[in-house]
């Protein structure tokens, strides 16, 4: 009943703008089945008979929700067992998509009357913490189905809770006057409260409990039913509760056999709640409205804890939407982990690239700074050189007359050098002449020496002859006339010898005198030649120095050093 009231509050036209899957129309479900008596006799009703029929809501401003038959028809929409022909009934369709691992996923799709489908694909499933952005309402799918399962467990566990739920449902169905203003704010508050939670099971439980209490509070100002009718409604729901116990047991057996289908017994018993015009049997008043609400809240809390435990222990095959949601949630979490890892790796790569680029930029900045320093130094040196060139240019402008004087001096020195060269050539000719004379004198000296040697030989012969004659004279003194002749010859020979000696000595003296004169002249010539050479060398060095100075002056002035000067021809000659 709490799930039914939750759907009643969610189907309010004031809250339909929050659901993206359904338009602002009331969804009614037409069920092809027999009479009510056949349902009461516990006959099963085929599951292939559900059809979705979309009809416009009769009154947009009606504060009353859907009937119990429509609510139960909506709650009985569950996933059928997958058959070989892939046939789906009750206006439900499934779309097959390929998952990331290569498999196929089936997603349920609602088809409206105008052939517009509401799919429960990956893009339409709700995100955790953002339930208000989904394409369908949170209470229209998983929460309501599990809430209906919790209703069956509530009916099966005891009769007191069934009585309380029956009394509340009877009061909501019998009271025909329109509800007052606090209904819509309470419903919207309950919807917002159910959507803002993080746990879906706690949201469904708080939603159903809040809707039941809000229904009591909304009807309490305009409640005008007598205490006898309240007791009668409680007794009537006690009678219905017994049948609901059997129906809930049958429903659980059927769901265990067919994996998610509901029994028609619960449909038959709960469809009696639609008949609000039947007069309730007379029962005595048992409890007040506050006690019923308090007891209902306590039982709802207890059964909510039990339902939460059952939901935790239930398998995913009991609810197809839950299975789809869990599969999608698992896939989303895996994809989220992969995306986190991918983006973490990308972030690490980007950070490394940024660090490398930062280091490269720092290195480039350092190189640029060094290059800037080097260029600054070169600029300073070029500025200094330009200043020096300017100074040299100013000096060259002032050294114009000095350059002319130096050119004149150079021309004079070149003339002197040419004269010295002429004198050198004359002296060399004289030297050659003197050398010829020396050679002739040497030949004459050799001839004189030969003559002297001959004369010495003759004198030696004469001396030997003289000695022989003296010896003979001493031995033969008798021969006087002969001796006189010999003495005459001897004297003559002595005189000739003395003459030859004197001539030889005279020749030696003349030769010595000539030799001395030649030597003196030779020394004079050599000394003069040395002086000429030294002066020539000195003039040559001075000429080179002057040429260098002229070249420097020309470079300072801007003239090309290769341009010939007037005095260079003279120097070369």
Swiss-Prot record:
<dbReference type="GO" id="GO:0030424">
    <property type="term" value="C:axon"/>
</dbReference>
<feature type="compositionally biased region" description="Polar residues">
    <location>
        <begin position="184"/>
        <end position="196"/>
    </location>
</feature>
<dbReference type="GO" id="GO:0031410">
    <property type="term" value="C:cytoplasmic vesicle"/>
</dbReference>
<keyword id="KW-0966">Cell projection</keyword>
<dbReference type="Pfam" id="PF06818">
    <property type="entry name" value="Fez1"/>
</dbReference>
<dbReference type="GO" id="GO:0030425">
    <property type="term" value="C:dendrite"/>
</dbReference>
<comment type="function">
    <text>Plays a role in axon and dendrite arborization during cranial nerve development. Also important for neural crest migration and early development of other anterior structures including eye, brain and cranial cartilage.</text>
</comment>
<comment type="similarity">
    <text>Belongs to the N4BP3 family.</text>
</comment>
<dbReference type="InterPro" id="IPR033571">
    <property type="entry name" value="N4BP3"/>
</dbReference>
<dbReference type="GO" id="GO:0007399">
    <property type="term" value="P:nervous system development"/>
</dbReference>
<feature type="coiled-coil region">
    <location>
        <begin position="289"/>
        <end position="539"/>
    </location>
</feature>
<feature type="region of interest" description="Disordered">
    <location>
        <begin position="168"/>
        <end position="216"/>
    </location>
</feature>
<feature type="compositionally biased region" description="Polar residues">
    <location>
        <begin position="207"/>
        <end position="216"/>
    </location>
</feature>
<keyword id="KW-0217">Developmental protein</keyword>
<keyword id="KW-0175">Coiled coil</keyword>
<protein>
    <recommendedName>
        <fullName>NEDD4-binding protein 3-A</fullName>
    </recommendedName>
</protein>
<keyword id="KW-0968">Cytoplasmic vesicle</keyword>
<feature type="region of interest" description="Disordered">
    <location>
        <begin position="382"/>
        <end position="407"/>
    </location>
</feature>
<keyword id="KW-0524">Neurogenesis</keyword>
């Amino acid at each position: 009943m709490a799930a039914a009231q939750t759907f009643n509050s969610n189907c309010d036209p004031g809250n339909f703008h929050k659901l993206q899957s359904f338009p602002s129309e009331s969804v009614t479900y037409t069920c092809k089945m027999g009479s009510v008596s056949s349902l009461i006799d516990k006959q099963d009703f085929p599951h292939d008979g559900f059809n979705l029929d979309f009809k416009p809501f009769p009154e947009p401003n009606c504060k009353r929700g859907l009937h119990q038959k429509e609510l139960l028809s909506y709650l009985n929409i569950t996933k059928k067992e997958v058959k070989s022909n892939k046939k789906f009934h009750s206006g439900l369709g499934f779309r097959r998509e390929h998952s990331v691992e290569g498999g196929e996923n089936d997603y349920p799709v609602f088809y409206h009357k105008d052939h517009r489908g509401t799919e429960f694909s990956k893009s339409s499933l709700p995100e955790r913490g953002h339930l208000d952005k989904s394409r369908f309402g949170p209470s229209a799918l998983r929460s309501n189905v599990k809430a209906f399962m919790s209703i069956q467990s509530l009916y099966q566990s005891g009769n007191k809770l069934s009585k309380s739920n029956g009394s509340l449902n009877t009061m909501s169905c019998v009271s025909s006057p329109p509800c007052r203003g606090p209904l819509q704010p309470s419903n919207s508050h309950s919807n917002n409260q159910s959507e803002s939670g993080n746990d879906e099971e706690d949201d469904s439980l708080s939603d159903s409990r809040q809707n039941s209490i809000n229904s009591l509070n909304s009807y309490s100002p305009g409640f005008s039913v007598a205490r006898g009718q309240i007791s009668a409604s409680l007794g009537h729901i006690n009678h219905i509760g017994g049948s609901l116990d059997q129906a809930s047991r049958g429903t659980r057996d059927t769901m265990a056999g067919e994996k998610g289908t509901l029994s028609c017994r619960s449909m038959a018993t709960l469809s009696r709640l639609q008949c609000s015009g039947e007069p309730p049997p007379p029962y005595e008043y048992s409890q007040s409205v506050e006690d019923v609400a308090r007891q209902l809240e306590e039982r709802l809390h207890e059964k909510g804890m039990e339902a939460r435990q059952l939901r935790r222990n239930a398998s995913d095959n009991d609810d197809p939407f839950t299975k789809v949601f869990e599969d999608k949630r698992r896939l989303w979490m895996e994809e989220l982990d992969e995306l986190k890892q991918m983006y973490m790796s990308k972030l690490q790569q980007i950070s490394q690239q940024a660090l490398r680029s930062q280091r490269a930029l720092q290195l480039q900045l350092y190189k640029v700074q060094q290059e800037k320093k080097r260029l600054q130094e070169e600029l300073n040196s070029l500025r200094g050189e330009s200043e020096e060139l300017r100074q040299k240019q100013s000096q060259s402008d002032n050294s114009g007359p000095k350059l002319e004087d130096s050119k004149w001096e150079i021309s004079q020195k070149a003339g002197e050098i040419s004269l010295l060269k002429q004198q050198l050539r004359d002296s060399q000719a004289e030297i050659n002449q003197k050398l010829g004379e020396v050679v002739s004198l040497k030949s004459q000296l050799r001839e004189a020496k030969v003559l002297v040697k001959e004369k010495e030989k003759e004198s030696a012969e004469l001396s030997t002859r003289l000695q022989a004659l003296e010896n003979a004279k001493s031995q033969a003194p008798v021969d006087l006339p002969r001796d006189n002749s010999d003495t005459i010859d001897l004297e003559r020979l002595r005189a000739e010898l003395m003459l030859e000696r004197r001539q030889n000595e005279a020749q030696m003296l003349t030769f010595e005198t000539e030799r001395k004169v030649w030597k003196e002249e030779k020394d004079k010539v050599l000394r003069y030649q040395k002086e000429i050479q030294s002066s020539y060398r000195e003039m040559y060095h001075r000429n080179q120095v002057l040429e260098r100075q002229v070249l420097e002056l020309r470079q300072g002035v801007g003239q090309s050093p290769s341009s010939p000067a007037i005095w260079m021809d003279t120097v070369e000659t």
